[in-house]
UniProtKB/Swiss-Prot annotation:
One of its GO terms (biological process) is translation. The keyword rRNA-binding applies. Keywords: Ribonucleoprotein, Ribosomal protein, RNA-binding, rRNA-binding. GO terms for molecular function: rRNA binding; structural constituent of ribosome. This is Large ribosomal subunit protein bL9. Belongs to the bacterial ribosomal protein bL9 family.
Length: 149
């Protein structure tokens, strides 16, 4: 099925590209999410008329994500306190939700879906590097310090 991409899709294409994808992927994911439209003559003409507007919107989203990444990098570290045992293991764990709340409390708005924990939830005290994916192309990292209450 031929579709026109309205957003940059990893491993597929950029804004405005006409790509051939499987029908189910287009019908069940790309089109309902607003990431693509079917490549009919009417849609192609409509897209060409709106191309500059859509590309400006994508560029604005990218610039906003880069600005937030710079703010996160400027924080250097965020401290989270949690109950822990004698050997430095936490009672429970620190998940993406707690990290997102701590960074938001520090002054930078972050959603929990933007936090990437490569090894799963944090279960020990100490310093941990946490990565953030704020946009398809914008990544940053932050040091999270977990201390005992």
């Amino acid at each position: 099925m031929q579709v026109i991409l309205l957003d940059k899709i990893v491993h597929l294409g950029n804004v405005g590209d006409q790509v051939n994808v499987k029908s189910g992927f287009a019908r069940n994911f790309l089109i309902p999410q607003g990431k693509a439209v079917m490549a009919t003559k009417a849609n192609i003409e409509h897209f060409e008329a709106r191309r500059a507007e859509i590309e400006a919107k994508v560029a604005a989203e990218l610039a906003a994500a880069q600005a937030r990444a710079a703010q996160i990098a400027a924080l250097e570290a965020v401290t989270i306190s949690s109950k822990a045992g004698d050997e430095g293991r936490l009672f429970g764990s620190i998940t993406t939700r707690e990290i997102a709340e701590a960074v938001t409390a520090a002054g930078v708005e972050v959603a929990k879906s933007e936090v990437r924990l490569s090894t799963g939830p944090i279960r020990t005290l100490g310093d941990h590097e946490v990565k953030f994916q704020l946009h398809g192309e914008v990544f940053t990292a932050l040091n999270v310090i977990v201390v005992a209450e």
